[in-house]
A protein has these predicted regions:
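Phosphate-facing sequence motifs and polybasic nucleic-acid/acidic-lipid-binding regions
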Residues: 1-244
Length: 245
């Protein structure tokens, strides 16, 4: 890997260089993760483990960050039965979606090639004036010729994170995901232990609504700071770039 020399460069040069590097990470999550904690008070003789119903529904969450510390809109992908894979506009409106979140749909609930193409146009609405780089893993939808062609047309080069070293080279895995997941989990557990939560007839907590889930994502994403994002790139990428020739 070619060494990037930034010493002696102006602040503006460094800022412009860092702004050219983005990283996106898609991860599957559950609307109602399995609960192993008790919600009883400390000291109770009988302790019940009350969790949501057994049926779990998976969703995909995509988080994009920039080496300069910027964050982009968090993307939530819900499973939909629509033939087009699109969520109807009136349903989207009912979610009361926060400004820092985009909600999309697919028939599988996974990140599809159609969503990936839409993502590329969303992230890069115009061709980039200077060479720009997008760091991603080797997911099949990322390695498509169509994805490479779309990015190349916009002057964006795709850099694949080595499969065997994702935890080491993927910026979100270093700090961003850890911070986000901890915040999201704390909100879920607070909801689980709330006396106001609704329960089913059998005493199980009802699954959180999609609207609730979206707002947890929004709040947790807001809690990921610029410093956290920069630290992720420093730990995952730049320490390797500066050490290799």
């Amino acid at each position: 890997m070619k060494k990037i020399e930034m010493e002696g460069k102006s602040d503006d040069w460094c800022k412009n260089a860092l702004a050219r590097f983005r990283n996106v990470d898609q991860t599957s999550t559950q609307l109602a993760p399995a609960e192993k904690r008790t919600v009883e008070k400390t000291g109770e003789k009988r302790v019940r483990i009350i969790g949501p119903p057994e049926e779990k529904t998976c969703f995909t969450l995509a988080l994009t960050v920039n080496a300069n510390g910027a964050k982009y809109l968090a993307i939530v992908v819900f499973k939909t039965s629509s033939k087009t894979g699109k969520i109807p506009s009136h349903v989207l409106k009912s979610y009361n979606i926060p400004e820092n979140v985009i909600v999309m749909g697919s028939r599988s609930g996974w990140w599809t090639k159609e969503l990936d193409d839409e993502y590329i146009h969303l992230m890069y609405p115009e061709n980039q004036d200077a060479p720009t780089f997008l760091l991603r893993d080797h997911a099949p939808v990322h390695t498509r010729n169509m994805a490479a062609a779309l990015l190349k047309k916009k002057n964006v080069t795709q850099i694949f994170v080595p499969n065997c070293r994702i935890d080491e080279f993927q910026p979100p895995d270093a700090t961003v995901n850890r911070t986000f997941k901890a915040s999201f989990a704390s909100k879920y557990h607070a909801w689980m232990s709330s006396p106001d939560r609704k329960q089913t007839k059998t005493g199980n907590a009802q699954n959180p609504s999609k609207t609730q889930f979206i707002h947890w994502v929004s709040e947790a994403w807001n809690e990921v700071t610029t410093e956290c994002v920069k630290a992720g790139f420093k730990e995952a990428c730049w320490k390797h770039i500066s050490d290799e020739n």
